[in-house]
Amino acid sequence: MNKLLSFAVAAALSLGGVASVQAAEITGAVGATSQSGMTYRIGAGWNWDKSWWESSTGRLTGYWDAGYTYWEGESDHSSAQHSLSFAPVFVYEFGHGYLKPFVEAGIGVSVFSSTKVGEQDLGSAFNFEDRLGLGVKIGETQRVGIRATHYSNAGIKQPNDGIESYALFYSHSL
């Protein structure tokens, strides 16, 4: 398991070099699951470079998000899991100043290394990812916030316990 974790960390760190050429931002997140386990996520985002409903209140925009999450297991690490996810995310930014509060929401897909995460049985490795977050955009290069993410297979296969992750995140534009 340590070799797998080392490989995942090395891959995530090398993602930064690749992503700097093509991605608009790199995101790191640390969170806890609904089962009290820890999660660690690294992701890359590509801004849509479009906005809708622009007004003095703010604007609607969005980005594509791809990420890798390490789901910490028991103390022996034998129950640790990994997941890859991809989602379109809509963002509403309030205001036009240096600090812009925002809310975000998205629904995407994910694939897990196992159907069990802690005590939760997801029923299948393929799951949907629903997210809701809020935070502050700092200038044009940084975002910090909190995010709740729910994973389940939408009843495609039973059991479908689902699992949630609640995380603090930081994003930096490249």
Where are the regions that the model predicts?
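Cleavable N-terminal export/targeting peptides
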Residues: 1-23
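Transmembrane beta-barrel strands of outer-membrane/channel proteins
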Residues: 28-32, 64-70, 103-109, 146-150
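Outer-membrane beta-barrel "beta-signal"
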Residues: 41-44, 162-174
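Residue-level signature of outer-membrane beta-barrel architecture
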Residues: 32, 46-48, 92-94, 136-138, ...
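Extracellular loop and loop/strand-boundary signature of outer-membrane beta-barrel proteins
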Residues: 29-30, 74-76, 117-120, 153-157
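Membrane-embedded beta-strands of outer-membrane beta-barrel proteins
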Residues: 42-44, 88-90, 132-134, 168
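Short sequence motifs at beta-strands and strand-loop junctions characteristic
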Residues: 34-36, 80-83, 124-127, 160-162
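Short loop/turn motifs that connect adjacent beta-strands in outer-membrane beta-barrel proteins
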Residues: 20-24, 49-60, 95-101, 141
